[in-house]
Amino acid sequence: MDFPYDLNALFPERISVLDSNLSAGRKAHGRPDPLPQVTTVIDELGKASSKAQQLPAPITSAAKLQANRHHLYLLKDGEQNGGRGVIVGFLKVGYKKLFLLDQRGAHLETEPLCVLDFYVTETLQRHGYGSELFDFMLKHKQVEPAQMAYDRPSPKFLSFLEKRYDLRNSVPQVNNFVVFAGFFQSRSAVQLRKVPPRKPEGEIKPYSLMEREVVREEQRVLPWPFVRPGGPPHSPPLLPSSPQSRSLSVGSSPSRAPLRPAAATVLQQGQTPSSPLNDSCRAKRTSSLNRSRLSFH
């Protein structure tokens, strides 16, 4: 893939390693900022890779590389395109936290180095460029192909791994990553945890929801003296105990004050509640009335 500017000035090495800084070397004094051109190269490579893999959207871009701790290995041929160079392909790797299953069903939580995207220009495939790029990454990361995980590898990529690195027996996973049998050989038994079998889902009874509602209602306690209709009456709250009746010894129960039900007074129509003051006033008015009546006789 060629571009309308000198790629040798952007990427001085045959294989350049880019990280979130998007810089493959030192910025030359007096030259314009190479970041816009590097961004264009990465974005166009990501689009070409997604088109070759028939993906709905690119998984490699300059913005995504800046936002993650990934490494992009970019391979060029500096003699092509009139000495300005062409991009042959790229390989993107990064560490991912994964939950994997081995051949026995044991569960492993690990964070391996993963191949996230791999692309070689269609016209330059089957010339050994892919092997050169992949071998450079393995040496740079000091890792074996079987120790890595592969994110949604295409059939062509799986054929490349089998032919070049003898990776044949993949272990089925519940996610989009592919690992091979050798991946679990370097993991200790402490890292492996047997996954408990899932409980069979039983049929939900039609009255189970009603029963749960009844239990939930029974757990609610209304404040005294509001008593639930149809239910057993709740005891009235305890009166605060006097200092003499409160127990201070460890292990003894506090004494309860005796309950004194208040007597209800029923008033007939026309009656008013009586009190000593009212009775005294009524007696005085009656005595005065009697004396006034005697004076007229």
From Swiss-Prot:
Its EC number is 2.3.1.108. Residues 226-297 are annotated as: Disordered. Coiled coil: none annotated. It comes from Danio rerio. Residues 230-240 have a biased composition (Pro residues). Residues 241-264 have a biased composition (Low complexity). Disruption phenotype: Morpholino knockdown of the protein causes developmental defects at 48 hours post-fertilization (hpf), including cilia curved body shape, short body axis, hydrocephalus, small head and small eyes. Morphants often do not respond, or have slow startle response, when probed with a needle, consistent with neuromuscular defects. It comes from the Eukaryota. Disulfide bonds: none annotated. Gene3D superfamilies: 3.40.630.30, 6.20.370.120. HAMAP family: mec17 (MF_03130). It is found in: Cytoplasm; Membrane, Clathrin-coated pit; Cell junction, Focal adhesion; Cell projection, Axon. Specifically acetylates 'Lys-40' in alpha-tubulin on the lumenal side of microtubules. Promotes microtubule destabilization and accelerates microtubule dynamics; this activity may be independent of acetylation activity. Acetylates alpha-tubulin with a slow enzymatic rate, due to a catalytic site that is not optimized for acetyl transfer. Enters the microtubule through each end and diffuses quickly throughout the lumen of microtubules. It catalyses: L-lysyl-[alpha-tubulin] + acetyl-CoA = N(6)-acetyl-L-lysyl-[alpha-tubulin] + CoA + H(+). It is an enzyme of class 2 (transferase). This is Alpha-tubulin N-acetyltransferase 1. Residues 266-278, 286-297 have a biased composition (Polar residues). Changing residue 154 to A: Reduces activity to 8%. The gene is atat1.
